Amino acid sequence: MGLKKMKGLSYDEAFAMANDPLEGFHEVNLASPTSPDLLGVYESGTQEQTTSPSVIYRPHPSALSSVPIQANALDVSELPTQPVYSSPRRLNCAEISSISFHVTDPAPCSTSGVTAGLTKLTTRKDNYNAEREFLQGATITEACDGSDDIFGLSTDSLSRLRSPSVLEVREKGYERLKEELAKAQRELKLKDEECERLSKVRDQLGQELEELTASLFEEAHKMVREANIKQATAEKQLKEAQGKIDVLQAEVAALKTLVLSSSPTSPTQEPLPGGKTPFKKGHTRNKSTSSAMSGSHQDLSVIQPIVKDCKEADLSLYNEFRLWKDEPTMDRTCPFLDKIYQEDIFPCLTFSKSELASAVLEAVENNTLSIEPVGLQPIRFVKASAVECGGPKKCALTGQSKSCKHRIKLGDSSNYYYISPFCRYRITSVCNFFTYIRYIQQGLVKQQDVDQMFWEVMQLRKEMSLAKLGYFKEEL
């Protein structure tokens, strides 16, 4: 049917004609929802239908019969049933924009010998093209001569009406996605800030942990160092105390020796009262004849002289002592000590074992010599080296077989040397001399003047002289 014939038709006639069954077309449910395929025309011309059709085509029973129908012999009643509307209505633009055409696969029509050859369905693209042509015919547009449309619509206007809706949906979707993206970016930014804050906290805690560890190690090292210093100080004080104890023991022995040696050897006799002198009774042989003749014996009194200890200082030696007293020193090269070394110390400490004697002198000078009694100590505790240098029955300095009641130790050595009482007295006399002059050097002797100090030194020299001559005192 051409468009020119439809130009003069009224609205009712055109609508009735539109309701009549059309030859060669299938039934289309115009009241169905808008087809997704038509909405997809704007987006892609090659997009295929993805939803299942919702329109069921109901062909006439005669169309399904096996008897072939001659061409151009179809009646209106033989066409597929048309959709039934409650009342005729005019489609406006809003309704057209919401119409969805669902096209199913066409059923084969029994036309003159053609139905036997159509065994396969047409593609979705062909169906879409047919549907579009049908739409263009159904809208009854008059594009050729520019006359007004019967329904006041055209394909272009329908597309224009439908396009803003799709664009609006896309814009809304784009805006929603954009908002979600912005929200996700804000959340990501917050997460990044939180991670950065936690990283700073972690770094700060790590730095504080390192500082705390370093301070703890430093404090521990400081405590260990202080403990080591205290231990070393305590050991030093203990060693000094032991040295002082040894010195005090030597001083006690020296004082005991001084007390024993200071007693007078010959007491002074006092004159008898009345001016009488003591006499000793006795008899003498009378050599003269007059004595015999007298017949009497004459008693002769024996008068003993009264003696006392006297002392006089050697001026040269006294002057040397005064010079040494002004600047006391333990250097043996000074004149005062050099004379004492030559006259008293060397002779007193000269023994047959010269090497051991030199070691004893060095220990006495350094104040590192110790003397202890043997007592009742078992022999098994005596070291082999000490036994080799002398045993309880052999003196290590003289090499003679003597009963050794004492033993000496030199410095930090672990060896002990057994000595006889004679050697012990000679060593202690020298030790007493060195102890006293050390006190003078350290300023500990304050209750005596120079003369008293000098005579005390001379008394100690006297003890050394007696010891080197063989005079000694043995403890019982």
Curated annotation (Swiss-Prot):
<dbReference type="GO" id="GO:0005813">
    <property type="term" value="C:centrosome"/>
</dbReference>
<keyword id="KW-0344">Guanine-nucleotide releasing factor</keyword>
<feature type="modified residue" description="Phosphoserine">
    <location>
        <position position="266"/>
    </location>
</feature>
<dbReference type="GO" id="GO:0005634">
    <property type="term" value="C:nucleus"/>
</dbReference>
<dbReference type="InterPro" id="IPR009449">
    <property type="entry name" value="Sec2_N"/>
</dbReference>
<feature type="region of interest" description="Important for RAB11A binding">
    <location>
        <begin position="435"/>
        <end position="444"/>
    </location>
</feature>
<dbReference type="GO" id="GO:0006893">
    <property type="term" value="P:Golgi to plasma membrane transport"/>
</dbReference>
<feature type="modified residue" description="Phosphoserine; by PKB/AKT1">
    <location>
        <position position="163"/>
    </location>
</feature>
<feature type="modified residue" description="Phosphoserine">
    <location>
        <position position="263"/>
    </location>
</feature>
<comment type="subunit">
    <text>Homodimer. Interacts with the N-terminal region of SSX2. Interacts with the GDP-bound forms of RAB8A and RAB8B. The interaction with RAB8A is prevented by phosphorylation of RAB8A at 'Thr-72'. Interacts with the GDP-bound forms of RAB3A and RAB3D. Interacts with DCDC1. Interacts (via the N-terminal region) with TRAPPC14; this interaction mediates RAB3IP association with the TRAPP II complex. Forms a heterotetramer with RAB11A where RAB3IP homodimer binds two RAB11A subunits.</text>
</comment>
<comment type="similarity">
    <text>Belongs to the SEC2 family.</text>
</comment>
<dbReference type="GO" id="GO:0005829">
    <property type="term" value="C:cytosol"/>
</dbReference>
<protein>
    <recommendedName>
        <fullName>Rab-3A-interacting protein</fullName>
    </recommendedName>
</protein>
<dbReference type="GO" id="GO:0005085">
    <property type="term" value="F:guanyl-nucleotide exchange factor activity"/>
</dbReference>
<feature type="modified residue" description="Phosphoserine; by PKB/AKT1">
    <location>
        <position position="165"/>
    </location>
</feature>
<dbReference type="InterPro" id="IPR040351">
    <property type="entry name" value="RAB3IL/RAB3IP/Sec2"/>
</dbReference>
<feature type="modified residue" description="Phosphoserine">
    <location>
        <position position="296"/>
    </location>
</feature>
<dbReference type="GO" id="GO:0051020">
    <property type="term" value="F:GTPase binding"/>
</dbReference>
<dbReference type="Pfam" id="PF06428">
    <property type="entry name" value="Sec2p"/>
</dbReference>
<feature type="modified residue" description="Phosphoserine">
    <location>
        <position position="288"/>
    </location>
</feature>
<keyword id="KW-0597">Phosphoprotein</keyword>
<dbReference type="GO" id="GO:0006612">
    <property type="term" value="P:protein targeting to membrane"/>
</dbReference>
<dbReference type="GO" id="GO:0042802">
    <property type="term" value="F:identical protein binding"/>
</dbReference>
<dbReference type="GO" id="GO:0048471">
    <property type="term" value="C:perinuclear region of cytoplasm"/>
</dbReference>
<keyword id="KW-0653">Protein transport</keyword>
<dbReference type="GO" id="GO:0060271">
    <property type="term" value="P:cilium assembly"/>
</dbReference>
<dbReference type="GO" id="GO:0051490">
    <property type="term" value="P:negative regulation of filopodium assembly"/>
</dbReference>
<feature type="compositionally biased region" description="Polar residues">
    <location>
        <begin position="287"/>
        <end position="297"/>
    </location>
</feature>
<keyword id="KW-0966">Cell projection</keyword>
<dbReference type="GO" id="GO:0033365">
    <property type="term" value="P:protein localization to organelle"/>
</dbReference>
<dbReference type="GO" id="GO:0031982">
    <property type="term" value="C:vesicle"/>
</dbReference>
<dbReference type="GO" id="GO:0015031">
    <property type="term" value="P:protein transport"/>
</dbReference>
<dbReference type="GO" id="GO:1990635">
    <property type="term" value="C:proximal dendrite"/>
</dbReference>
<keyword id="KW-0963">Cytoplasm</keyword>
<feature type="coiled-coil region">
    <location>
        <begin position="165"/>
        <end position="260"/>
    </location>
</feature>
<dbReference type="GO" id="GO:0036064">
    <property type="term" value="C:ciliary basal body"/>
</dbReference>
<feature type="region of interest" description="Disordered">
    <location>
        <begin position="262"/>
        <end position="297"/>
    </location>
</feature>
<keyword id="KW-0206">Cytoskeleton</keyword>
<keyword id="KW-0175">Coiled coil</keyword>
<keyword id="KW-0813">Transport</keyword>
<dbReference type="GO" id="GO:0005654">
    <property type="term" value="C:nucleoplasm"/>
</dbReference>
<dbReference type="GO" id="GO:0030027">
    <property type="term" value="C:lamellipodium"/>
</dbReference>
